[in-house]
Design a protein with these regions (language model features):
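Glycine-rich beta-strand-centered segment in the early N-terminal region that forms part
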Residues: 23-37, 50-97
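Generic structural detector for well-ordered beta-strands
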Residues: 19-21, 126
Length: 129
């Protein structure tokens, strides 16, 4: 099985239900089978084309979701297959000056799940540990 269903924002104001590849995880990522996903106000703004200049289409939205880990990369230490998780949608590097001061929202390479990266309006989602 290497395909999944996802709600893909193909153009602003248009979402298509598509069969897409299940994300492949890297050594420090986990694969989550999404169990629950919520629609947030920012999802609505992205749908309408009003929200974020970094968003590019096509995009799988959804930054508020939870599920169960079904696969882990070989360097993942804090999670195991079967763990139930809710995802922090902010992905920071942990290495830049802002991150070293624990000011993660100012990370120089900050990415937001469902905004910069595909999100949880899908059957599976990958995120870094």
């Amino acid at each position: 099985m290497n395909k999944m269903n996802a709600a893909v924002l193909t153009e602003y104001k248009k979402i298509d239900w598509k069969s897409v590849d299940i994300p492949k995880i890297s050594e420090n990522e986990v694969l989550i089978k999404v169990g629950y996903a919520c629609i947030c106000g920012s999802d609505q703004h992205i749908f309408l084309g009003e929200f974020h200049p970094r968003t590019s289409l096509p995009l799988i939205q959804g930054h508020e979701f939870a599920g169960k880990i079904v696969a882990i990369g070989p360097k993942v230490k804090n999670y195991k297959v079967g763990d139930r998780v809710a995802v922090d949608p902010i992905i920071w590097c942990g290495k830049c000056p802002a991150c070293r001061r624990h000011h993660y929202p100012a990370c120089t390479t900050l990415k937001l799940v469902g905004v910069d990266l595909d999100g949880g309006f899908s059957e599976y989602m990958k995120v870094p540990e």
